[in-house]
Amino acid sequence: MANKELKRGLGARHIQMIALGGTIGVGLFMGSASTISWTGPSVLLAYAICGIFIFFIMRAMGEMLYVEPSTGSFATFGHQYIHPMAGYITAWSNWFQWIIVGMSEIIAVGSYTKYWFPDLPAWIPGIVAMVILGAANLISVKSFGEFEFWFAMIKIVTIILMIIAGIGIIFFGFGNGGDAIGLSNLWSHGGFFAGGFSGFFFALSLVIAAYQGVELIGITAGEAKDPQNTLRNAIQSIIWRILIFYIGAIFVIVTVYPWDELNSLGSPFVSTFSKIGITAAAGIINFVVITAAMSGCNSGIFSAGRMLYTLGVNGQAPKFFKKISRNGVPLYGTIAVLIGLAVGVVLNYIAPPKIFVYVYSASVLPGMIPWFIILISHIGFRKAKGAALDKHPFKMPFAPFTNYLTIAFLLMVLVGMWFNDDTRISLIVGVIFLALVVISYYVFGIGKRTQANLTKSEQAAE
């Protein structure tokens, strides 16, 4: 075992597909109705508004990655351009978010497998999926990329087919005796803003959560071939991804079905495919949901392992986390993530259910921390680089105004979470988690260790 470099094993097709579908989770296929119930058809506007600010976040990250493509991505930028504690908080927040995502996705695999094998204990397919994905991540970054490529492909094809089917139903009457449904469902059941301003405002916190994980592509920077061009192309296309895969799918759902009947329909995807005569729709979507869950877990193992590696490199976690295997994989970081997932899955079946409600809730706010850090560190990055950025081909539009505007929007979403009884617990538990991370920074003397590690690095460079 040697402390080598991470291998650049992710090609352009891997990066593009991770960017296109890597963060589309189970929620879009199965849980979109609950979000729509808050606000009605105006959820379309909520997705569009959130999508614009996500675009700014990604462009800020892209501008920095073009100059400094590193595995630590936003954690490294926070460390360099804000304060070492900012990098520490960001890395642990991202690690925690992806551990929780991975746990929930593994549990989802077990639950959805019961569609075909109702008597099979749910933990068995979950553990099998985790072992397969764990092995793929340990073998090489390319094997992670191959799994994610095909998982994303399945999700993307399903969404595109669903949008095509929906357009056929809306404008040509497919599955409806030739009678086009039209667009009336967008306003005929209580109006476009059926949930009122408060419903729309509260829905923003649920919609913004649907975009969490979109920054995953930044973590691939240290292992991408030709990172400048592949990441630039992937990030530049994000606005089209948002329009097609999020807004396009939601448009079909709220146009084909009255929004106030969605909760009784089950999955809108199943209903749409069934409507045009695909009798096996439930089984097909169940398979897609399992692949979406495995994709989320796969991304979680990759991302959380790289965050532990970054913490090790920065002197903010045990040194062994920065050890690299012969295959160019952060071995101990990945193994630690797999152990954490396994423990979490076991505890899910033996611990009181309420404990995991709090654990899952705690991941929402930490999941937003990387966005704040990207925006703030980008301001410091601009100041540090100065005139060197004049010829940068990939600059964030209207910075730093858009930085401050996006930060204000994210803070407004957090305020909305506080005033909503259903999301307040997420904010409270998330703040407690972040407070514990800050306390650990001082209790364990992370600042001194970081400075000592920086001094050693500077001496080695001389």
Curated annotation (Swiss-Prot):
It is found in: Cell membrane. Gene3D superfamilies: Amino acid/polyamine transporter I. Its main location: membrane. PROSITE patterns: AMINO_ACID_PERMEASE_1. Keywords: Amino-acid transport, Cell membrane, Membrane, Transmembrane, Transmembrane helix, Transport. InterPro entries: AA-permease/SLC12A_dom, Amino_acid_permease_CS. One of its GO terms (biological process) is transmembrane transport. The chain crosses the membrane at residues 17-37, 38-58, 89-109, 121-141, 154-174, 190-210, 238-258, 276-296, 331-351, 355-375, 398-418, 427-447. It is a multi-pass membrane protein. One of its GO terms (cellular component) is plasma membrane. Disruption phenotype: Deletion of the gene confers a weak resistance to growth inhibition by serine. The deletion of the three permease-encoding genes aimA (ybeC), ybxG and bcaP results in an unprecedented resistance to serine up to 100 mM. Belongs to the amino acid-polyamine-organocation (APC) superfamily. Probable threonine transporter. Is also active as a minor serine permease. This is Probable threonine/serine transporter YbxG. The lineage of its organism: Bacteria, Bacillati, Bacillota, Bacilli, Bacillales.
